[in-house]
Amino acid sequence: MGSEMCIRDRADAMYSGILVDTDNFVIKAGVRTFEAAAYLRRAGADVTRVRKMFREDMEHCRIRTAIINKAEIYMDEFAISTFDGENVSGATVVGAKAANALLNIQGIRGSFVLTALQDCIYVSARSIDELNVQVIMEKFGGGGHLTMAAAQLKDVSLSDAAEMLKHTLRKMHEDGDI
């Protein structure tokens, strides 16, 4: 019984890792990804149990919704939102989830959520596949990859950081870099 539980727990953990890495089988999910998921299901991974692990509390849901509601559509293709993360546990995670959700808006190529927290602005940048957010975040000293990237800005206000981002997006667009 104990070893079966251990195997099941490990299968759940690995399956949840696949869900996170592929954004629920949306990004970079190939045949081998699905084969691995099927193997883990046969090994005891439970989709319902794993899904319950990813639930968020009501306060985080409300904050994420407020971030989405506050978003500005910039240049008809970028969703940008800001939020003060002080006194919010897991503020950067909530910001990243909001950035993911903003990609569901039709016509949005990239989403950016700027979170102010402890004298730093954390930028979560997301895209589906039409925009390389890594090259944008590299302009701010950050990094990541094609569809998920981030940066941290010091000694700048939330509003100034948003304006810097807009300026960078406009310039890169005009130069044909994005």
Model-derived regions, located:
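Short, small-residue-biased leader/transition segments that mark boundaries at the very start
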Residues: 1-7
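Active-site histidine-anchored catalytic micro-motif
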Residues: 9-14
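Hydrophobic helix-and-loop "lid/oligomerization" segment in the mid-to-C-terminal part
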Residues: 15, 20-178
